[in-house]
């Protein structure tokens, strides 16, 4: 629960072209992961996948993370076990997620055009 800024957008440049948004765009490469290991000092942040700690792969075979928006949840001075990798990402079927928000590619592309660095999302 809470109200969160939308921080930045990560995307797969080999699968997605010409994104239109006012948020910062960052490319996803094969060596990128998001640390979800509460024992790591890098908890809830982008890391290289050669880490000894557990992480979620950003460069995936499926299309789930072809485009993601990072929510400002537990990012500054992350508290272990409070939650990590809270994203808005792609889905085909709008099924529930493990704490994220999932949208169709069409809807996510529309959202990207409408949001700015001041946009907040309220999760209830």
Model-predicted segments: where are they?
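Cell wall/extracellular polymer interaction/catalysis modules
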Residues: 1-98, 108-124
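Extended catalytic/binding region for NAD+/ADP-ribose chemistry, centered on the ART fold
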Residues: 99-103
């Amino acid at each position: 629960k809470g109200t969160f800024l939308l921080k930045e957008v990560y995307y797969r440049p080999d699968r997605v072209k010409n994104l239109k948004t006012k948020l910062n765009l960052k490319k996803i490469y094969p060596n990128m992961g998001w640390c979800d290991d509460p024992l790591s000092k890098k908890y809830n942040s982008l890391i290289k996948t050669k880490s000894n700690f557990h992480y979620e792969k950003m460069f995936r075979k499926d299309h789930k993370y072809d485009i993601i928006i990072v929510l400002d949840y537990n990012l500054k001075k992350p508290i272990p076990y409070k939650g990590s990798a809270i994203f808005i990402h792609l889905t085909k079927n709008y099924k529930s997620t493990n704490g994220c928000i999932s949208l169709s590619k069409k809807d996510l592309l529309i959202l990207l055009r409408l949001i700015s660095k001041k946009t907040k999302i309220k999760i209830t």
